[in-house]
Amino acid sequence: MISVKNISKTFNTPTGKVEVLKNVNLEVEDGDVFGVVGFSGAGKSTLIRCLNGLEKVDSGTIIVGENEITKLDRKQLRNARKKIGMIFQQFNLFDSKTVYENIAFPLEISGYKKENIRERV
């Protein structure tokens, strides 16, 4: 489950402040498939980066599963991210690996057991 309540995010630029997210609200239930669509510069990537704590919001709350992302310390956030899947806009795959191996790789280096990796992939 993902719950986003009134989040806002502003960036400082050489020409002034740019408000990229303003009072965004969103609910995604377990099992739902959800996409974020919009024009270039609309804030899609910023929203996703806020959901997993790569960007800090200026205000509002984000809950993913049982974790309030906006209140986690670094260690807690690192552990919470292990249960959050994200596909970056630009990413690289290892040409020498199969699809399965590419998906399993980050789980392996995070210390997951082989049987858990098999289940997640």
Question: Residue ranges of each PLM-predicted region?
Answer:
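Beta-to-alpha transition at the N-cap of a short helix in the ABC ATPase nucleotide-binding domain
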Residues: 89, 93, 98-100
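The feature captures the beta-strand-to-loop junction immediately N-terminal to the Walker
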Residues: 37-39
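ABC ATPase NBD coupling module
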Residues: 15, 69-85, 114
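Conserved coupling/switch loops of ABC nucleotide-binding domains, chiefly the family-specific signature
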Residues: 58-61, 116
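Short helical segment in ABC ATPase nucleotide-binding domains corresponding to the A-loop/adjacent helical element
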Residues: 100-108, 118
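Helix-to-loop junction immediately C-terminal to a conserved catalytic motif
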Residues: 52
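Conserved ABC transporter NBD signature motif
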Residues: 60-68
